[in-house]
UniProtKB/Swiss-Prot annotation:
Protein family per UniProt: Belongs to the CAPAB/TerDEXZ family.
CDD domains noted in UniProt: TerD_like (cd06974)
The protein, known as: Uncharacterized protein slr1764
Domain of life: Bacteria
InterPro entries tied to this protein: Stress/Tellurium_Resist, TerD
PANTHER family: CAMP-BINDING PROTEIN 1-RELATED, GENERAL STRESS PROTEIN 16U
Length: 179
């Protein structure tokens, strides 16, 4: 499995050059100290339609499906994930984002999170293609635009962005809409 750094991209194609039509992006994390409860929420923003799929509306975007909300990050493997079915999606780019739920009132930030990473899979074969660490330099930020799934004429390219933000889901979505 490839380990991506900020700014690196991965073409989502099969060895024969055809497009991977179904991908999954998983998010895993641990809390920095025992007894803490930090709820990270994975959500997807479709820039062109200005739609957001998140824990209260998991199917807001055609072709996108979100997993159930993991409130603690406990356990092995991916804590939350999103699936993209390219045969059902609209044209345009999809942004994979994460925020800390209710961070402002809970006085929480990414400095309370360890080992957070995003992993992209070929969901047709359940094969991990690449991972990207997202907890470096999180500091007092409460959200991050993790990656972009760029539509490149019938297939997608995954780009690790790592853009930290202080904001909730709405504020992060507004940043994406302005891109």
């Amino acid at each position: 499995m490839l380990s991506l750094e900020k700014g690196q991209s991965l073409s989502l194609t099969k060895p024969d050059g055809s497009s991977i039509q179904k991908v999954r992006v998983g998010l895993s994390w641990d809390v920095a100290s025992i007894g803490s409860n930090v709820d990270l929420d994975l959500f997807v923003v479709h820039k062109e339609s200005k739609k957001v799929a998140f824990f209260n509306d998991k199917t807001a975007i055609s072709g996108i499906k979100l997993s159930d909300d993991n409130l603690t990050g406990e356990g092995e493997g991916d804590d939350e994930f999103t699936e993209l079915d390219a045969t059902k999606t609209d044209d345009g780019d999809y942004y994979i984002c994460v925020n800390i739920y209710d961070a402002k009132s809970r006085k929480q930030a990414f400095n309370l999170v360890n080992n957070a990473k995003a992993t992209i899979y070929n969901n047709e074969t359940n094969t991990a293609l690449a991972s990207y660490s997202i907890t470096e330099d999180g500091g007092q930020n409460t959200g991050i635009i993790v990656a972009k799934l760029k539509d490149v004429g019938g297939s997608y390219e995954f780009t690790a962005l790592g853009e930290y933000i202080v904001g909730d889901i709405n504020e992060i979505a507004q940043v994406v809409f302005r891109k």
